[in-house]
């Protein structure tokens, strides 16, 4: 076989993965790839010389020349054996380091080679490097990384270059480092590189030894603690008269705590309490306190979660099944869920952190009672597949309601948030903070301030309940709040929430809700079958308009339940087998109607204008009546339980009339010598708000000029002394009330024109809206003859005196309290 001086210039190539062969070594090589098998067979049919060279990337299955290093080892093939599976096992003897000048690819790789020039080496430097290499190798070998036989073989080498090759082969260096040793043909350079690698290996061995010592110390410590703990259990058992259950109590808590997967800081604090319990007599008063505390801690879901179902289509289906209408609310909820789904998908791809998934606005549902705020929160939890917890905050006056009591107090308990988490059994429930606008405050603290930490996404992952004394992560909880009056929510708390407004239901929506949800539920609750009772649409419409007066449907469901119970009684006593409830038969079941809707005037009247108001239970119209009494000078009398703001609107209207007296041809002498009385029925109901300014001005100017106000026009808007007409709120509810009263024309501020789109289309198409920017424009629509009649001089015969009875031609119905104009 050829030696290093007689190698062929072109030889077959056998690529290998993850290993390097050095000269003078004898090595087995397994070949399974076609390119390697073909090269071995070519070598055996030729001069039995083959080039062993490493791949740069071991994952390449079909290597080409560029995938291989340029320095390899020329080897003599000693023996080849074919395995039953077709693979080959080759025994080679490495001859020399060679430089590859070019690779050629056919059925197998061949290489043009030439031996590497070793250069000159020797002298004192080589001797010093040799001694240093032997010393470092002995140090590394003493660490047990090389077996004794290999150490003996290496130490027996007389050639220092050959010794260096064997050291590099036997130590666990990276492929790049082993290849660098192969490419170092000069012995001096080879020793320098190897010494650098041995220095690194020594440092690694030192760190490993330190880690092993620490692990051994920790194991010894745990074994010692276990031994002492077992001794304590035996001693406690003897002290307690053999009561094994008491002796195992601390251990039972410890086992539960270990299973919770707490972070080290929290676990350290809780373990301290367990150790205190273990040292106490079980009948000690403090032991009972600690026992209760540990029970709370171990029952909290520190790492238990519900799997989110963020299917937007399924959520939409659930919301539609559970609620009728509320389209804007549903759209916002679905947008919220869609954003959370996209965030979760990005977190799964590693594009954002897991903490970012749960960040987002805290939703607060605002609106009158009974419009579905609480039930839609339940539907959100249902669609997400999360547990649902409702926390009623109405009347809460103590900070401890939120944060809990400190354990120093007798009967201390966690706050309602932690109690809700334990009730849910998961750390990511949907928690409804109900009636958040009705939080109180006292000398014991302000619960709304405590809620700031709960609802702040940047703080609530470290929420600390006073009772627990350790942080609990609330960042995965989905908080939803509800309120009837958002203006009563503290500003700092409101700033952390996004408002979703629930409007009052219109009569058509109530009718559909009654047929789809309320009737089936009441039939089920009262034991009736659908074929035993039926309601006509006219009966339900009369129930809505004459027996209930609300924005939602709670009272409507109660009235349906009352009818259902009476029918159930008749069926149970055999008086009837089934009942069909019509509008004419309602009085038989419910008595006389309790509400008579306000209706428009039947004729145009002087001094009587029609305004609009709304309350939490819906909107309606009101009448502003003005009477002029001569003989007493310059006074303004206001009656009808008007609030301060409404009184100021009347004074502003009078000032506006006086400042425009000449233009409107108002008798100034009569004005100065008359007392003006403004009354707003019904007098038993408090009224407040600025939006009656237009109605006040129309009524006053109508009375002062004798020009009648139109009976088919209702108005809302705030006026200024300069005659501007300013925007107001609650337009939808007011218009719905006006339409119910038969009004066809609505005067509203120009700035509120955009709110007309919130009114259902079938109502908008049956009414006419008059957006106004000034009071002059209001008067032009509201008075008979308009602004032209005002600005035209009038004789006494043309002036119609104000009617003595402001109620002529209409009937006055009952209104809900706290009407806001």
Curated annotation (Swiss-Prot):
Location of the Lon N-terminal domain: 11-202
Keyword terms: ATP-binding, Cytoplasm, Hydrolase, Nucleotide-binding, Protease, Serine protease, Stress response
Active site as annotated: 691, 734
Where does this polypeptide localize? Answer: Cytoplasm
A matching Pfam family: Lon_C
Every copy of the Lon proteolytic domain together lies at: 603-785
Region feature (Disordered): 792-821
EC identifiers of the protein: 3.4.21.53
Q: List the PROSITE patterns hit by this protein, alphabetically.
A: LON_N, LON_PROTEOLYTIC
Would you tell me the Gene Ontology cellular component terms? cytoplasm
Please name the GO terms of the biological process aspect recorded for this protein, alphabetically.
Answer: cellular response to heat; protein quality control for misfolded or incompletely synthesized proteins
**Which annotated residues bind ATP?**
367-374
What's this chain's function? ATP-dependent serine protease that mediates the selective degradation of mutant and abnormal proteins as well as certain short-lived regulatory proteins. Required for cellular homeostasis and for survival from DNA damage and developmental changes induced by stress. Degrades polypeptides processively to yield small peptide fragments that are 5 to 10 amino acids long. Binds to DNA in a double-stranded, site-specific manner.
PANTHER family linked? ATP DEPENDENT LON PROTEASE FAMILY MEMBER (PTHR10046)
Subunit comment for this entry?
A: Homohexamer. Organized in a ring with a central cavity.
Q: What is this protein called?
A: Lon protease
Its taxonomic placement starts with:
Bacteria, Thermotogati, Deinococcota, Deinococci, Deinococcales
